Amino acid sequence: MSNSPKQDDLFHDIMEHPIADQIIERANQAMEKEARHRANFREWLTPSVKAEFINGEIVMHSPVKRRHLRVAENLHYIIGLYARKHNLGEVSIEKALIELGRNDYEPDLAFWLKERTLEWDNDMMVHPAPDFIIEILSESTKDRDRNTKYVSYESHGVGEYWIIDPVKELVEQFVLVSKPNSKDKFELQGTFGIDEVLTCLVLKDLVLPVAAIFDAQENMKFVTELTK
């Protein structure tokens, strides 16, 4: 998915450079400055503002289109109800600040397994890496969702990542896979269309028709079944 250079390749390139020490020193100074900027961002951020801190910059989000909002609401109905019914964990839509390395994100939907939330404080503002994240594409966010966020989510152990295209009505499902002598990597489980069925691997036994993500009537039908 991402075209970003591999971490090992970047490290090798720096260490092979004759002024590697100067590059590292300059990077350290930049990261110290960025950390101060990030602290100011967190103090400035309020519940009424949707913004993220990505690679040293504050990224503001404009109001979403109706189709984006409908998809987000449909997903929250399904995943929120399923997680509560089976006591699986915590679900957040849009406003949970996620700390991943140097960046702070507010995913469209995030889920944490119950055992990871038992000692959470009700006043906490900054959250650890979720077990499951969903991002809904828009023109302004699609590059970040497919590249910067993809790399961050993968490298910080997010177990499952869905990228949803609300215009094409498609869901791309990525699952974190462990391999011997290698870092965990996302693998594409499949791209699912409106007439297909999708199985969530993190929320055990959740099998949903993709139509329930995009269509209000199909969503209501599926949610009604979940309540039985």
Feature map (PLM): residue ranges:
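Gly/Pro/Ser/Thr-rich low-complexity, intrinsically disordered segments predominantly at protein N-termini
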Residues: 1-228
